[in-house]
Structure formats: structure tokens, C-alpha cells
Amino acid sequence: MGKVIRSLSRFGKKVGNALTSNTAKKIYSTIGKAAERFAESEIGSAAIDGLVQGSVHSILTGESYGEYVKQAVLLNVLGSGEEIPDPLSQGETEIQAKLRELEDEQRNELVRLKYNDKIKEKFGEELEEVYEFMNGAAKAEVEDEKQFDILNKAVTSYNKILTEEDLQMRRLANALQKEIGERTHAETVMVKEYRNKIDALKNAIEIERDGMQEEAIQEIAGMTRGVLEAASEEVPLIGAGMATAVATGRAIEGAYKLKKVINALSGIDLTHLRTPKIEPSVVSTILEYRTRAIPDSALAVSVLSKNRAIQENHKELIHIKDEILPRFKKAMDEEKEICGIEDKTIHPKVMMRFKIPRAQQPQIHVYSAPWDSDDVFFFHCISHHHANESFFLGFDLSIDLVHYEDLTAHWHALGAAQMAMGRTLSEAYKEFLNMAISNAYGTQMHTRRLVRSKMVHPIYLGSLHYDISFLDLRGNAQRIVYDDELQMHILRGPIHFQRRAILGALKFGCKVLGDRLDVPLFLRNA
């Protein structure tokens, strides 16, 4: 269990602090009044800060030594359905989620219409029965079937899809890690197809990157969504690799409405079982190797990163299948004896036993302080039910404070075994506010508002799904906390833009490119 409380870094922050530093006070005590007036000027404070740190460069640019403005790129692609909302705008978040759901439904239906026979041949006729049950077009024998059997078929079919997806991803990763001469014919074909997709993505990203402004955090605007999804899908389960409707595991599950059937019959929400359409580490690798060939080993790392999310989803489904469904069946039998209900149907009372509060679902939950809400907000990030982990990530942007802490697990009907470790969300939130209240840089009014906020519960602003694995999500959060250079690049622009950049860096990651600004050229053309 870990806890980190740090001050956030911004460009020019060291310059701003130069006048109040102990080193600056010593300098002021040894120089005359005229020199002190120079020191209090804008260029003077930069000069002192620069000289103290050994960099005359800061005199010209207003930056401290080592602070160079570079290009920063959020590792998502516009047009992929993964646009980043302002986390404090609940309406914006809900509208984007609903639009994505509608678009996905339409695309998944195309997959079912195009590949129905091949999918049934590979994963069994049970998929069609589940789909017909959900659509109300079930045959007489299916209607007579027990609802629990339909639920079992939906879970089993989903398990088959995730097993196959995991297997194919591991095959691709193993092929990429082998020497070219050691690959079988099938592995060579698989790697060649994958490399063709990477080249298509690389070309699209390179075109966008050339048009980026130097001094802004950017998102990559990609190709049309259909082409983008086809190009970024490592191994389609059915059909050609670059078809317009790709039969991915995600698309097959959506086409046959497996999660919806499971939710309708059991009350168990599995919408958190997601995989990224475009793996952020792939975008990062392409940006890193944009001027040279990408080695197979780097691509293998990206494939394994995406496979972590698939394996996490698979473990979650096995947890539901092996741990939760037997308890669900037992609850059904108990309810049947008490209420005398029909054996074929599942009573709503049974479903309600397995409902969990929205604030404990495996998502990124967003809260803000009741006062000074634009600046003081935090994320509560919860893992899949089988892992039962969570962490707190709080920000006070008015005084540049960040607080990360691993929290204790919640108990609920779908959770795994508990361990008494860590603190609760409420305890972490109160300590976060206490640290902000005691900060010397806060204004008197801000401190008063924080004291008031501490007396009441924070405002819940909704939740967002994350597509990457929880391990990668935690890694992104810790990088935001520890990486000063990343902080400098995401904490620029209007306050709502900074919040979006923080959320983007958390959900997808952020790549700070190594291209340094050509300062003489910049000043010459300014």
C-alpha cells in the first residue's frame, strides 16, 4: 500500500518562487538597493533563478534550468470514440458515453449480419439462442427453457470468446519475440499482417504529428473510425484483418448482446469488461520510433500490454462463473421456496441481492470539493471485482498539490476475499484537504473554503469507464504524481483544459516527445 503527497510542477514555477527562496534572500542581502530593484523585475528574478541553477538560458525564455517546452501527446486517437470530456462536466460525460454506445451497437450489428454463420461455427449455436432471447424472437423451445440456463449459456459463450482472444494475442506476442528464421509459416503471415496495420497507423499518426503546434498538448486526429479500428486490431477472431467490419472479441460480444443478457437476467453489470480500441502503448511506440523502423520486440510489449486488459477481463468472468453464479443459484432456490415462484423464471428479489452501489463499480469515479470545486477534485479508481483494489488521486490546482494513495477494498456482493489493508476513501479525502489547508501558498479565502468543504461529504460527479488494465491505470496515475516534466505539459491552458489533460493522461497515458524547442530559431522568428 502506498501514499504520495507532492507539489505539482509548472513551467516558470521555479522562476516565480525565486524571490521567496532562501538562496534569493542571501543574494538580496549582499547586493545594493538598485540591484534589488532589478532582482524584483521579471527578467531579474529569472536571471537569479538561472544563475543559481547554472543556466543563463532562463534569462531569455523565463524558464528554469532544464525546463524545455516539448510536444506532449495524449495517447488516444480522436475519431476512435475515445474523446476526453471535462471530468467535472457530468452532462458532457454522459452524452459521450451514450453516443459511443449507440455507435457500437450499430457497428456490432454489421459484424453479426456479415459473419453470423462463421461465428456460430466457431463459438457454438448458443450465441444465437442468447441473441434471440434478448430480442424477444426466441423459438418455442427456447422460451420454455429456464432463464438460469440462458444466463449460463451467455456466460459460457462470453468465456469462449475471451479465451480465444487471449490465445490469439499470446500467439502474436510469441511470434514477435522470435527471430525471423525461427517463425513458422503461420507466425510469419500473422506478423506480416500485423506490421501492415502498424504501418497504416504510423502513416496516419505521422501526418497528424507534422501538423501539430509545438507548444500544446495534443490529441491525434485519426482516420475514419472503421478504418482506424480495423488497422489497430491485432488479431481478428473471424474474417480478414483489414475488413470494414472487424469481428473482434469486443464486437462479437456486443453483436450477440451477451453483457445485456447477463445484466437483464442476474442484475450483474459487466460493462467494465472492456479493451482499448487502440492500445495506448502502440501509439506511444509509433511516436517513439517515428523516424526509424519499429523493432518486433517493441511491438511485442504493446501486444502484451493490451493482452493484460484481456486477461483481466477473462479472470473477472471466471470469477463470476465460478464464485458468483453458484451463490446466485442458491439464492434462486431459497427465493423459490419462500415465495413459491415458477422454476423457470428468476425473481427480481434475487437480482437485487447482487446489485452493487454505483460508487463501488469498477470505474473512474469523479468527485469535487463542495467549495472551490473547479480547482479541488479527485478520482477514485476501482479495479475489477476479482482483484478488489482501488486508489485515490486528488488535485488542488490552485496551490498545485497532488495526493495519491492506495485504498482498502470494499465489501460487496460481487467482491473477492477481503484483506484489512489501507484506509477508506473518506479518510484519504480528509487528509488531502488537511494538507491543502496547511499549504503556505493558499489564499485565506481558499483555505476557508477548504475548511468548509472538509466538514461535509464531497460532491459525486459521475463515473467513466477505463479500457486499459488496472495495473496500467495505476501506472499512469503514479506517473502523473512523480513525473515533473509530464506535469509541466498537462498543467497549461484554461482550467477545464487542464482537467481534460489530467483525465487523458490517467485513462490513456501521455507521451512527451523528445524534440526540444530550437530557442535561437524561436526567438529569431518571434
From Swiss-Prot:
GO molecular function, one term: structural molecule activity
Pfam families associated with the record: Orbi_VP5
Keyword Chloroplast part of the UniProt annotation: no
InterPro entries registered for this protein in UniProt: Capsid_VP5_Orbivir
Cell compartment(s), UniProt: Virion
One annotated Gene Ontology cellular component of this protein: viral outer capsid
Keywords, in A-Z order: Capsid protein, Outer capsid protein, Viral penetration into host cytoplasm, Viral penetration via permeabilization of host membrane, Virion, Virus entry into host cell
Positions of disulphide bridges: none
Region of interest: Involved in membrane permeabilization: 1-42
GO biological process, one term: symbiont entry into host cell via permeabilization of host membrane
Family of the protein in this entry: Belongs to the orbivirus VP5 family.
Cited function: VP5 protein is one of the two proteins (with VP2) which constitute the virus particle outer capsid. Acts as a membrane permeabilization protein that mediates release of viral particles from endosomal compartments into the cytoplasm. Permeabilization activity is probably negatively regulated by VP2 and is triggered by endosomal degradation of VP2 and exposure to low pH.
Descriptive protein name: Outer capsid protein VP5
Naturally occurring in which organism (per UniProt): Bluetongue virus 1 (isolate Australia) (BTV 1)
